[in-house]
Each structure stands twice: as C-alpha cells, then as structure tokens.
Amino acid sequence: MRWCLAVVAGALLGACPFLSYGLLHMGVVALVVPWVARRWAPTVVAGAVVVLAVIAWGAAGFWLWDGIEATREQWAAGSGTGRPYLYFLAADVVLLGVLVGPAGAGGLTRVARLDRPARALVLVAVGSALLGALSGFERGEVERIWLPLACWVAPAAAALVDPGRATAWRWWLVAQGAATLVLATVLRSPW
C-alpha cells in the first residue's frame, strides 16, 4: 500500500508544474514529509514518477522549461517590465503576508513554539516563497504563485495560541476576519 501511495503522490506532484508554474515550489514543500518521517525509500519512488511525468509531457510535445521560458518572454513583452525587480521582490513578500493574514504573519514571529513537523513545513514554505521571489521568475504572478504556498504558511498562526491565555486566539480570529473584510471591500482587481 505504501508503494501505491508513493506512486500516486509522485503522479500528483508530477502534474503540479503543468497546472501552474507556481506549483513548482510544491516539490520543495513535499520534501518536508520524508524529512520529518525519515522515510526516504517511498520518496525515491515518488521522485522517479515525477521525473517520468515530466518526460511523458515532453514526449507528448510540451517541454516544461520551454513553457517557463515562453512565460518569461510573454511577461517581458507586457506592462510589467516598467517596474523594477525590487518592486516585485518587495510586493511579492508583502502580498504573501496579506494572503496569510495578520494571524499567519504574526505566527511567523513565534514559529519556534510549533512542534517539529509543523515548524519544518512552515519554514520550508516560507523559504520556498523567498527563493521564488529572489529568482525573479514570478514577477506580477502573486495570486497564482503564492496562494498554494500561503496554505502551508498559514499554520504558523497556531503558534499564537498561548496555553496560559486560552482566549487570546479570539482576537487573532477577529483580526483575520477584519483584514479579509477590508481587503474584499477595498481591493479592486481587473481579474
């Protein structure tokens, strides 16, 4: 059964970059599971299936790296070129904070309180997001790139729960809801 799950996991992870280039980061996040569980044999099987998926897509006529390069060229021909790299670097990091909300961002300051698996997941997701921002590939693609990673950064909010003050989490929940309402009311997007 474990090997079947490894094959299914590899097939799903292998499909990720073909659904959205933003899901390329999920390969790094997925490595947290075997690192924490210390089970590398199923990971090797899943990794082989990922490689086979990329090769199969290539044999079918879609080479991943050509698609990434075409996306970069299309971005270079668009209106985003008028903004400097540092703009996108700052905007991407700020918008990741907006996506996880005040509780998620606040939880990052106390991430050491989380247990080892949760802490590893959150830190690897944040690290993957920062590497993506530093690479400059995701300029102007915040909603597609960061949303999948934000789901793995948001558990940092669990670090805000103080066992001595069991009701403190309520204020973080209020802040999260208020931030969502403000963003939904104020933000206008052409998409």
Feature annotation, model-predicted:
Residues 2-5, 114-125, 162-173:
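Membrane-interfacial loop-to-transmembrane alpha-helix junctions, especially the N-terminal start
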Residues 1-7, 13, 24-49:
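Perimembrane helix-loop-helix junctions
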Residues 89-101, 140-164:
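Hydrophobic/aromatic-rich transmembrane helices and adjacent perimembrane loops
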Residues 1, 31-41, 59-60, 106-115, ...:
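Structural signal for the C-terminal ends of transmembrane alpha-helices
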Residues 46-113:
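Transmembrane-lumen/periplasm boundary regions of multi-pass, lipid-linked membrane glycan transferases
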Residues 48-51, 164-189:
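Signature aromatic-anchored transmembrane alpha helix within multi-pass, membrane-resident enzymes
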Residues 97-122, 126-133, 156:
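Hydrophobic, aromatic-rich transmembrane alpha-helices
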Residues 125-141, 156-159, 180-189:
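Transmembrane-helix signature of polytopic, lipid-linked glycan biosynthesis machinery
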